[in-house]
């Protein structure tokens, strides 16, 4: 069985994708999103909403961090799944204390599950570059 945080990331990715495609406000999108799914544990729902709202709140910084390392790739040219996997992961890298390796591994798995054949490798490459720019203590180095 997958962890609550893993399930929350999956739901957060799905909600971010829906928001990206529908271009609607976050509150309306989340309300509609939760109505379209089987009920989930309150903790999973709360974690997912926290991630979605965090990405939305810090979207400019998140997008800038992605674009700074995405050579020859503008965000608007990326596949929607890849773009939102990256947004979710970069938010976690920049704004949470979740271990860097965990964030990257979970993002790669989301890319493989929901993206194209090359999504996992693409996500890995971008996130490795973002992570290399983090302070050593954040990367788990001494």
UniProtKB/Swiss-Prot annotation:
InterPro entries for this protein: NusB-like_sf, NusB_fam, NusB_RsmB_TIM44
GO terms, molecular function: RNA binding
Species of origin: Anaeromyxobacter dehalogenans (strain 2CP-C)
Function (record text): Involved in transcription antitermination. Required for transcription of ribosomal RNA (rRNA) genes. Binds specifically to the boxA antiterminator sequence of the ribosomal RNA (rrn) operons.
The encoding gene: nusB
Protein name: Transcription antitermination protein NusB
HAMAP family: NusB
Family, as annotated: Belongs to the NusB family.
CDD domains: Terminator_NusB
GO biological process, one term: DNA-templated transcription termination
GO cellular component: cytosol
């Amino acid at each position: 069985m997958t962890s609550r945080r893993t399930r929350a990331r999956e739901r957060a990715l799905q909600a971010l994708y829906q928001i990206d495609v529908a271009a609607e406000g976050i509150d309306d999108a989340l309300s509609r999103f939760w109505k379209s799914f089987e009920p989930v544990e309150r903790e999973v729902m709360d974690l997912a909403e926290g991630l979605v709202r965090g990405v939305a709140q810090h979207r400019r910084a998140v997008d800038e961090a992605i674009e700074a390392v995405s050579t020859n790739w503008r965000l608007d040219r990326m596949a929607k799944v890849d773009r939102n996997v990256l947004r979710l992961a970069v938010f976690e890298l920049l704004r949470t204390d979740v271990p860097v390796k965990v964030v990257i591994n979970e993002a790669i798995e989301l890319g493989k599950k929901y993206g194209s054949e090359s999504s996992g490798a693409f996500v890995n490459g971008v996130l490795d570059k973002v992570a290399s720019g983090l302070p050593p203590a954040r990367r788990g180095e001494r």
